[in-house]
Amino acid sequence: MGSAGARPALAAALLCLARLALGSPCPAVCQCPAAAPQCAPGVGLVPDGCGCCKVCAKQLNEDCSRTQPCDHTKGLECNFGASPAATNGICRAQSEGRPCEYNSKIYQNGESFQPNCKHQCTCIDGAVGCIPLCPQELSLPNLGCPSPRLVKVPGQCCEEWVCDESKDALEELEGFFSKEFGLDASEGELTRNNELIAIVKGGLKMLPVFGSEPQSRAFENPKCIVQTTSWSQCSKTCGTGISTRVTNDNPDCKLIKETRICEVRPCGQPSYASLKKGKKCTKTKKSPSPVRFTYAGCSSVKKYRPKYCGSCVDGRCCTPQQTRTVKIRFRCDDGETFTKSVMMIQSCRCNYNCPHANEAYPFYRLVNDIHKFRD
């Protein structure tokens, strides 16, 4: 009985060795280009089958081989068909990946598509992730650009910033800084204002933001007012989701969006089994045993005992109150490793203010990020 069960596994191993032997041989010494290849929007870099060089990952229905692997972060694998001697295949979605529905259309797991000219999206195991193709529209122009405005360019999809160089606009800009900050205002004083300068049509105005970062920086830019918003709510009320924030804490002082993996609670978690007598809520629960985080088919190298938010019996919802962000290394089946930011819950709170987090609305839309779509 045992020998019969081992035969399929042995045959699969021999088939894999045959494919490796017939495939392109790996060089004795790795020789890679000095510069990394430029990939299309939404396409990441992955190591080739020899573990030598970074190459652009092949996408759904594209040709693949040992030296041109598929994008495993999107649930794709190289399908060589039934021939054991095949060295080239086609990128197909793994069988366990779920399709996605977007705008009444069905997309297969791992399939990339453009819903419009400004976004590139990918279906990842039932969730849709999108990246902007017009990054200049997301960031503000330099402060030295008077009366900026976004204008349409003939023949192009993305709008571009233009500056009004008129004398009146320059005087308005100079008067703004003289009045609001004073000409001798230090960079530290500007940072403590905890305000972000927003340049809008018709002039400039101050917008409050949340959670300003400490003033000390690895880089110094005297013209940059470093500000960072709070993390958004997790895109899922159970299971793995995404949380985002906006910051200009970078050498270019450009507004960028950062993401982190989050999990408010595991799906299928018993809601009220652990409630003590007379209690209506379970705020924070710790994982009973060490677990590995999962992301895009890959698992964390180490095990953790994270805290989760509980639930209530009186209609209130429990959401994270205090969190921290840690860097966690993930490893995939092919040996590839990468690091992602992950939310760690420190405490939760329960209240009746449940926008998009009520159990009656299990998913909500998070623009330009991984989310579930629901009509």
Curated annotation (Swiss-Prot):
Short name of one Pfam family = Cys_knot
According to the UniProt entry, its GO molecular function terms are: extracellular matrix binding; growth factor binding; heparin binding; integrin binding
The residues forming the signal peptide are 1-22
Gene3D superfamilies xref list: Complement Module, domain 1, Thrombospondin type-1 (TSP1) repeat
InterPro entries given in the database record: CCN (IPR050941), Cys_knot_C (IPR006207), Glyco_hormone_CN (IPR006208), Growth_fac_rcpt_cys_sf (IPR009030), IGFBP-like (IPR000867), IGFBP_CNN (IPR012395), Insulin_GF-bd_Cys-rich_CS (IPR017891), TSP1_CCN (IPR043973)
Domain VWFC, which positions?
98-164
Q: What is its main location?
A: secreted
Q: Where is the CTCK domain?
A: 281-355
Keywords noted in UniProt = Disulfide bond, Growth factor binding, Phosphoprotein, Secreted, Signal
Write out the GO cellular component annotations: extracellular matrix; extracellular space
Question: Which pairs are disulfide-linked?
Answer: 26-50, 30-52, 32-53, 39-56, 64-78, 70-91, 281-318, 298-332, 309-348, 312-350, 317-354
Instruction: Indicate the segments forming the TSP type-1 domain, all copies.
Output: 223-268
Its GO biological process annotations read:
apoptotic process involved in heart morphogenesis; atrial septum morphogenesis; atrioventricular valve morphogenesis; cell adhesion; cell-cell adhesion; chondroblast differentiation; extracellular matrix organization; integrin-mediated signaling pathway
Q: What does the entry say induces or represses the expression of this protein?
A: By V-Src.
As recorded in UniProt, coiled-coil segments are none
Q: Which residues form the IGFBP N-terminal domain?
A: 23-94
Q: Tell me the segments the record calls region Heparin-binding.
A: 274-310
Quote the PANTHER family the UniProt record gives: CCN FAMILY MEMBER 1, CONNECTIVE TISSUE GROWTH FACTOR-RELATED
Q: What does this protein do?
A: Probable secreted regulatory protein.
Name of protein = CCN family member 1
- The scientific name of the source species is Gallus gallus
